[in-house]
């Protein structure tokens, strides 16, 4: 049986994650995805999650926490896996991890084009 697996991003996932972001139209000319990933890895890499299905990355979430509020960026689910509960499963995991670090509120950033 095929199973979705949520795990922490590692640099070996970089190419697949950027490909996912491109599929989901999350990359804009003013945002270099490699620089965004590098910045995230310098701060709190345990709050950068991916979803794998048959060893292929089909979801991602880059999460920030400043001690007061959580922020969610690059929330993506491969279009072929949308409407299957993957986004909801990922959001539950995000909420769980932020609650564990004492976060009382989450801000989600969504572009009009998304």
What are these regions (language model features)?
Residues 39-50, 71:
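A short helix-loop-beta-strand connector motif used in the catalytic cores of GNAT acetyltransferases and
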Residues 91, 98-110:
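Conserved GNAT acetyl-CoA-binding A-motif
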Residues 3-16:
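A short beta-loop-alpha structural element at the N-terminal edge
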Residues 14, 18-41:
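Conserved GNAT-fold acetyl-CoA-binding loop/helix
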């Amino acid at each position: 049986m095929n199973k979705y697996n949520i795990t922490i991003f590692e640099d070996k996932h970089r190419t697949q994650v950027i490909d996912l972001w491109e599929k989901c139209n999350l990359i804009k000319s003013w945002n270099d995805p490699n620089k965004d990933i590098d910045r995230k890895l310098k701060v709190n890499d345990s709050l950068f999650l991916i979803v794998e299905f048959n060893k292929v990355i089909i979801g991602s979430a880059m999460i920030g926490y400043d001690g007061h509020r959580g922020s969610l960026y690059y929330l993506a689910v491969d279009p072929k896996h949308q409407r299957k509960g993957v986004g909801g499963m990922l959001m539950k995991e995000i909420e769980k991890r932020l609650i564990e670090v004492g976060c009382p509120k989450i801000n989600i950033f969504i572009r009009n084009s998304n």
